[in-house]
Structures are given as structure tokens and as C-alpha cells.
């Protein structure tokens, strides 16, 4: 009898599964990645039976269940590993396991940085440069995780890409001492200080609000935020010998977002005292020669290294980025799968708010370090994320620009008739009488 297309006498019943919620066994060979691509509503549960596997350097414990949602990531097998998994959206036929040929570069980098830490009280200050989807953030996360494994270090992770919501909401740049293991289940690396109980140690980021989506909307403001963050980082390194010896890992935006002359990188190197540059590209890529020629005199050619694009890096589109940004905002107010938080909604009069917004060259505004007052209307503020600064409510714009960030709030409703707003706060209490900055991000519950 003729068989149906795609099905023959050798096809097992397991291969005919079209997605269920049963446990399935998978063996990942040593040195290989299981490349996972989860939908926003999909949920994957993984349990390791034997062997050692990592997610960006964070090892998964044997016999513990890990839950993942809305994430594209690889599980790397340090040694041959048997694990169980279940997910209604995955089938045994759609699983992708491939050899990873770039981990040797990451190992070499880790031991090079470790040698610097062991021989000097001033740790390495590394900036990672490359194009989109080359693995800059993956490399940053892995190097931070390996530093924690090797010794009692607290590497300072510095995120300079406002579109990456790591330990904070999108639209910010931040510096975070990685003081303990990262949460392997979260694309946002883990949670910052929270009012709820958490399974893992919270991280405390130092945050500067840029407020816009793309750095080319206001390069001057972006560079000013880096300068201010650099001052905070310098103070932290001066006061904390452990962080100073651990060093910094600086994650940058895609090279395509920077000026042709790479002026932003010069600024980053100066303000953060960078002494090592890692370039994710091939040796034949024009970027490699350009970087060596541009930064060789500044850093020394012996301190500039190339690394091939990392294996296991998933292609991401704008829809996926938006989904991660939305997830990070939701987690800020409501918590993650393991940590439920209860935000606090309050009513606020129009007269009790002073809100500014950064200038934006795409809105026919001058792209410089300047803030403009915001008129309170539904079109301006409905569903908007606002940054609450430490500056007093009636402070001038220069003071507001330089002020640290107290936290973030979500404006869920603007009632013009009653001249009131409904504001969601992460903690109970009154809205602080502080100046606020409108960001470009919105969240519709």
C-alpha cells in the first residue's frame, strides 16, 4: 500500500506528534546547542536528567523544572546531556540541535579577562561592538555568568542600547553589578530590587533615562546620558573594590545605529575608561579594519580582538523586540512567572503633575540636550510610561536632565472632564512630588 506523503513504515508514533503537553526526552551532544524559538503565548518546561547544560553561561540544575516564555535562546551542552521537555507549541520534528563552533572563543576570552583580574586590582573594562544579531548581548551575558562561576566577582554590566530592556524598562541605559547568578528563565536577565519575594538575589541597576526609542532621535542627549552614567560608574568603582577588580562589560547598540566616524564609540571609551574592545565580525569584514585603524592609536592594537558572529544567535525582528519590551514593562509592574507583584493605582489631579519630554529630531524639534514641557491630554499621555526623577516638581529642565531616576509609572487613563489621571505605581503610596519625563513607550493593559 502506498504511504502518505511524509509518512512511511519507519515513522514512529512519537514523530507524528503535532504538539502536546507531555514530557519528551532529548539528548544534546557535547558542544551543541538546542536552538529554541518560543511564541509569545507558548510555554516550554525543561528538566535536566543528567549532564551539564547552560543558558548564556548560567548552568541549569539537575532535576529542577525551568519555565520559558516568549524567548529565542539556545541551551548549550557542556557535556552530553539528557533532558525532558514539554511544550504544546513544539514537536519532536521541529527541534533544532546544531554544533556550536564559537564557544571556544568565549572560553578564551573568559580566561584572558580572568588573568587580568588575578594580576591587577583594576579589572578589565571591555566594550563589545558589532552589527545587529551578531551576539553582543549573548556574549555580555555569558562573560558575566562565567566571571561569577570562577570567583566571588561582581562584574558591572553596562547596557548602552535603549531598546534592550535589561533590569529596567526600555528607553534606558544602565549599569548593573552582577552580584549573583542570573535568572536563566528570563530574557531580561533577572529582576531588579522589588517589593516582593524572589527566588534569586535581586540586582540593583544604576539607570539613566534616555526616553526615546532610537539613539539617532537625539544623539546629543544620548551622549549626555552616557556621560552622566560614566560619572556614576566611576563613583561606584572607586567605592567598591570588589566591583572595581571584577571590571566592566559594556554592551553597545548595533554599529548601524552609530555615526560613520564612530564618534559614539570614542565617547564611550572616554567616559567609561574602556581598555579592551571586542569586535563581533569576520577578519575579512571591513568593520574589523576600520575599528583597528580608528581605535588602534587609542587602545593599542593588542587590546582589540575580533570574534566571529556567535553560533546559536537567533534572527529577531521588530515584532519580537516589541514583544520583549512589552514583557519587561509588564514584569516591572506585575512581576514574572515566579514572582507576582501587585501595583498600586492612584488618582492624580492635572495640577499635581509636571511632565517634560526630550527633544526629538523626527518631531521637528532641535536634537539637543533639552526638555520641553508636556501638555496633559489623552493623546499625549494615555498608556504612557513616565520616568519619575529625584528633581523637585518645579525644578528647571537643566536640573531634571541631570537628576537620577527614582522609578517609573504608567498613566492608564486621562480624564479631561474631571482633569484627573489614573496612574499605576510599582509600590503603594502617593505619587512623589517630583518632576517627570515622558518616554516614547506605551503599554496597553
Curated annotation (Swiss-Prot):
Binding-site positions, ATP: 33, 72, 133-138
Gene3D superfamilies in the cross-refs: Clp1, DNA binding domain, P-loop containing nucleotide triphosphate hydrolases, Pre-mRNA cleavage complex subunit Clp1, C-terminal domain
InterPro entries: Clp1 (IPR028606), Clp1/Grc3 (IPR045116), Clp1_C (IPR010655), Clp1_C_sf (IPR038238), Clp1_N (IPR032324), Clp1_N_sf (IPR038239), CLP1_P (IPR032319), P-loop_NTPase (IPR027417)
This protein's record includes keyword Nucleotide-binding: yes
Mutant phenotype after disruption: Causes defective 3'-end formation and transcriptional read-through.
MF terms (GO), sorted A to Z: ATP binding; polynucleotide 5'-hydroxyl-kinase activity; RNA binding
Effect of residue 137 to A: Completely abolishes interaction with PCF11. No effect on growth
Domain of life of the native organism: Eukaryota
Outcome after substituting residue 136 to A: Completely abolishes interaction with PCF11. No effect on growth
Signal peptide limits: none
Keyword Metal-binding listed: no
GO CC list: mRNA cleavage factor complex; nucleus
Cellular compartments annotated: Nucleus
GO biological process, one term: mRNA 3'-end processing
Keywords per UniProt: ATP-binding, mRNA processing, Nucleotide-binding, Nucleus
Pfam short name (any one): CLP1_P
Main location: nucleus
HAMAP family: Clp1
Quaternary structure annotation from Swiss-Prot or TrEMBL: Component of the cleavage factor IA (CF IA) complex, which is a heterohexameric complex with 2:2:1:1 stoichiometry of RNA14, RNA15, PCF11 and CLP1. It contains 2 copies of an RNA14-RNA15 dimer and 1 copy of CLP1-PCF11. The complex interacts with the cleavage factor HRB1/CF IB to form the cleavage factor I (CF I) complex, and binds to RNA. Interacts directly with PCF11. Interacts with the CPF components CFT1, PTA1, PFS2, YSH1 and SSU72.
Function, in words: Component of the cleavage factor IA (CF IA) complex, which is involved in the endonucleolytic cleavage during polyadenylation-dependent pre-mRNA 3'-end formation. Associates with HRB1/CF IB to form the cleavage factor I (CF I) complex. CF I is required for correct positioning of a larger protein complex, the cleavage and polyadenylation factor (CPF) complex, which contains the catalytic subunits executing mRNA cleavage and polyadenylation. CLP1 mediates interactions between CF IA and CPF factors.
Family named by the database record: Belongs to the Clp1 family. Clp1 subfamily.
Name under which the protein is recorded: mRNA cleavage and polyadenylation factor CLP1
Gene name in the database record: CLP1
